[in-house]
């Protein structure tokens, strides 16, 4: 009998069992310190406000504080890269919107792979968009807008918040659906664009309801319709663009939560349960509603749902963005 070989095998087996026990113990103990939730945009913006609302409720579920950190730059790719390179221990999480799906096309030299370098946690909330016109812009309804757009084409100016912004994506989809080309006017954000729209220097703006509800309720803009698949409970008289003749038109600002690739399954489950806990929290539901956000149904609050949705969105936007031949790098 080879005693040294037997001892070596026993030690290896003991080490394997020890690693399993250690991993299980880690998952059971998680979290033992604050968890970072990285936001790729400025404090005070819609994604940041949503993240901070979720963080408060997630903290209750996890038993540790979830701290929101803002990491700005390059349309969210700076923050994405930070998370992709972080330790997959569950202490670095990330919330992002449609930009996660457009980055692989807009940036030809991404330092990460959007599909394979992250752990999927959950979809969380959608924010519909609205198509608005200046009070000085002639069309009053969406059918009138469609007719006018096909007559005037590039004489109509359409604002956006820059390449890859959801306002720009909405404008791209709108022009494709209409078969016309508008004159794009880029701004540093939709806030300045709204000021120009209110002043009559702009014709049209597509922006999320978090930004446009005050103007809509104040009747200082013309509302042509909403970009969601169905009418909104808080804007019941606003038709969808689908209803108005733009078949299959839909764009919402969707949000998902991710972690670095390689997170332990048990940790993913704990984080996912914390997200689901938050999405059922009446305070979160109310504050999300105040933003114009719609909590996704439970069936979408899973890692698999987020993974499938991201793939669909990448495939949806890639041909449109490539056809425009505009890149961010």
Task: Give the positions of each predicted feature.
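N-terminal (or domain-start) structured segment
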Residues: 27-116, 155-157, 163, 179-208, ...
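N-terminal secretory signal peptides that target proteins for export/translocation
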Residues: 1-6
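Hinge/capping helix and adjacent helix->loop/strand transition within the periplasmic-binding protein
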Residues: 85-91, 105-192, 241, 254-287
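C-terminal segment of classical bacterial N-terminal signal peptides
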Residues: 16-26
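Sec-dependent signal peptide hydrophobic core
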Residues: 7-15
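Short beta-strand->loop
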Residues: 113-123, 181-185, 203-204, 213-251, ...
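An extracytoplasmic/periplasmic, membrane-proximal ligand-sensing/linker region
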Residues: 32-34, 243, 265-329
């Amino acid at each position: 009998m080879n005693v040294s070989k037997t001892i070596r095998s026993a030690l290896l087996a003991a080490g394997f069992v020890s690693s399993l026990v250690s991993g299980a113990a880690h998952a059971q103990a998680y979290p033992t310190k604050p968890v970072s939730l990285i936001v790729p945009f400025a404090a005070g913006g819609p994604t940041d406000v949503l993240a901070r609302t979720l963080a408060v409720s997630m903290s209750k579920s996890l038993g540790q504080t979830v701290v929101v950190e803002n990491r700005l730059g390059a349309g969210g790719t700076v923050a994405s890269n930070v998370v992709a390179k972080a330790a997959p221990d569950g202490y670095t999480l990330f919330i992002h919107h449609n930009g996660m799906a457009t980055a692989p096309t807009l940036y030809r030299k991404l330092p990460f792979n959007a599909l394979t370098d992250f752990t999927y946690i959950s979809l969380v909330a959608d924010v519909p968009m609205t198509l608005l016109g200046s009070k000085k812009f002639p069309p009053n309804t969406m059918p009138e807008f469609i007719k006018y757009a096909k007559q005037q084409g590039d004489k109509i100016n359409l604002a956006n918040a820059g390449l890859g912004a959801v306002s720009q994506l909405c404008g791209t989809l709108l022009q494709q659906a209409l078969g016309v080309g508008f004159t794009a006017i880029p701004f540093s954000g939709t806030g300045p664009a709204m000021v120009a729209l209110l002043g009559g220097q702009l014709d049209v703006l597509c922006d999320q309801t978090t930004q446009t509800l005050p103007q809509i309720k104040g009747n200082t803009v013309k509302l042509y319709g909403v970009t969601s698949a169905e009418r909104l409970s808080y804007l019941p008289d606003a038709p969808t663009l689908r209803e108005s003749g733009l078949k299959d038109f839909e764009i919402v600002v969707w949000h998902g939560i991710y972690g670095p690739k390689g997170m332990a399954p048990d940790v993913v489950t704990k984080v996912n349960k914390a997200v689901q806990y938050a999405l059922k929290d009446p305070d979160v539901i109310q504050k999300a509603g105040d933003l114009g956000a719609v909590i996704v149904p439970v069936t979408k609050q899973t890692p698999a749902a987020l993974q499938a949705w991201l793939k669909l969105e990448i495939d949806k936007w890639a041909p449109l963005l490539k056809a425009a031949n505009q890149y961010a790098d």
